[in-house]
């Protein structure tokens, strides 16, 4: 499964399948005895996509050997920690008065339905038309009701998504909470820069941004992709996920944002595991160990 500059997908193929994969992990994490996230929509969304492996994974119906059990727990913990980090980011921004949020590459993200948004909150979901349409249909069938004003922006991030966002009512004069969750590695290095340029150009002072990145050299991307794929193969996944990441040297996210007017805070993934009461895995999981979580505030100190 190799990327091209004009490739497209649905939730059962290519990059779209990773959204289903992450939703399956959220379902697993939500079903734990002491969960740190609660996503009641993850499992039904995964079932609706119809990929057998991810459906069985979401419902805990896959038998594993000892290694695969460790992999499954690592997947659930990693996605739970990441999800909680972004949940907390949005809720903190809301407490600080931000009422406009944008979820880039929203996939099967259900935050517009499951977070306790303050009155007056507007949540924009940006993704490809087929992905948005699928989620709209499925959530409607589930009888789900958004907890904020939800506005969908049906556009590929490789196209003029800022114009599409503004066309759907986005207010550039108001501070915004932006998320780029699990996104950067699926963009070419130059597209990552353009994404941050666009966000900066749309952001009023006081806007906030959350993302995550690997600070190690781009030359190691292929190795990380193989580690990522091997873990899912051990769990029984028959979809090759190793060709989805773009290689090449990337801008350091912290440096790039700082140079473009953002006040940035960065924390290693290990710290988040500790904060949320999860045990960080052994040192051999270098793919996970190098991840840095980033929050930033535009035009003023955090």
UniProtKB/Swiss-Prot annotation:
Entry's Gene Ontology molecular function annotations: methyltransferase activity
Pfam families assigned: LCM (PF04072)
GO biological process: methylation
Disulfide pattern: none
Enzyme Commission number(s) from the entry: 2.1.1.-
Keywords: Methyltransferase, S-adenosyl-L-methionine, Transferase
Superkingdom to which the source organism belongs: Bacteria
Residues annotated to bind S-adenosyl-L-methionine: 127, 156-157
Gene3D superfamilies named in the record: Vaccinia Virus protein VP39
InterPro entries the record matches: Ppm1/Ppm2/Tcmp (IPR007213), SAM-dependent_MTases_sf (IPR029063), SAM_mthyl_Trfase_ML2640-like (IPR011610)
Reported function: Exhibits S-adenosyl-L-methionine-dependent methyltransferase activity.
UniProt cross-references to PANTHER family, sorted A to Z: S-ADENOSYL-L-METHIONINE-DEPENDENT METHYLTRANSFERASE YKTD-RELATED, S-ADENOSYL-L-METHIONINE-DEPENDENT METHYLTRANSFERASES SUPERFAMILY PROTEIN
Entry similarity comment: Belongs to the UPF0677 family.
Identification of the protein by name: Putative S-adenosyl-L-methionine-dependent methyltransferase MMAR_1068
């Amino acid at each position: 499964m190799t990327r091209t500059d004009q490739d497209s997908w649905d939730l059962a193929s290519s990059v779209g399948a990773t959204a289903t994969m992450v939703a399956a992990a959220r379902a697993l994490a939500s079903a734990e005895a002491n969960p740190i996230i609660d996503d009641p929509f993850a499992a039904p969304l995964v079932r609706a996509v119809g990929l057998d492996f991810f459906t069985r994974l979401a419902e805990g119906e896959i038998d594993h050997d000892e290694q695969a059990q460790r992999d499954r727990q690592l997947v659930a913990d990693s996605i739970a920690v990441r999800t909680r980090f972004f949940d907390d980011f949005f809720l903190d921004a809301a407490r600080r008065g931000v009422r406009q949020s944008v979820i880039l590459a929203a996939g099967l993200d259900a935050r517009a339905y499951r977070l306790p948004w303050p009155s007056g909150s507007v949540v924009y979901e940006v993704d490809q038309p087929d992905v948005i349409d699928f989620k709209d249909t499925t959530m409607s069938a589930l009888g789900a009701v958004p907890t904020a004003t939800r506005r969908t922006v049906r556009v590929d991030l490789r196209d003029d998504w800022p114009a599409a966002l503004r066309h759907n009512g986005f207010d550039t004069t108001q501070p915004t909470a932006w998320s780029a969750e699990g996104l950067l590695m699926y963009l070419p290095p130059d597209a990552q820069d353009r994404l941050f340029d666009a966000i900066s150009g749309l952001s009023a002072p006081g806007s906030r941004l959350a993302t995550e990145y690997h600070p190690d050299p781009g030359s190691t991307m292929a190795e990380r992709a193989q580690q990522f794929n091997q873990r899912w193969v051990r769990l029984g996944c028959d979809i090759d996920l190793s060709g989805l990441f773009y290689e090449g040297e990337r801008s350091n996210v912290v440096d790039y944002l700082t140079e473009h007017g953002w006040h940035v805070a960065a924390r290693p993934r290990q710290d988040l595991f500790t904060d949320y009461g999860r045990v960080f895995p052994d040192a051999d999981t270098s793919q996970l160990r190098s991840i840095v979580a980033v929050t930033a505030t535009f035009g003023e100190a955090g």
